[in-house]
Amino acid sequence: MNARCEPVYFGDESKKIILGDALTELKKLPSESVDLIFADPPYNIGKDFDGMVESWDEEAFLAWLFECIDECHRILKPHGTMYIMNSTENMPYIDLKCRQLFTIKSRIVWSYDSSGVQAKNYFGSMYEPILMMVKDQKNYTF
């Protein structure tokens, strides 16, 4: 969602980390070429990351996120596995979208202490949900 992000590549052809705009870089990858994906997309909560503010119209944000998930499905090998984490508010939408494409193997809860979440008038979320999903539920990368 940020066109100003220039891609940076680490590694060689057999193993690669790409730092760049997710959708732009995903579209460059060949179909069924990736064994494992761990995605931690923006949460769209209005946070400022060095001048880049996560604040989009909800419908546009979900459309962008779902397109990224579609691209991840396209590039994942038949035995591949994808993990995706996001906010507790967004995860129900992500879960529904991913069930259309994948088999959900696990719903993981990453629990942490309250040091980063300070809520005075409500109970703050002290966990983040992670989905583990596969294309083939009997033969997959773990």
Where are these regions (language model features)?
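Core catalytic lobe of class I
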Residues: 2-142
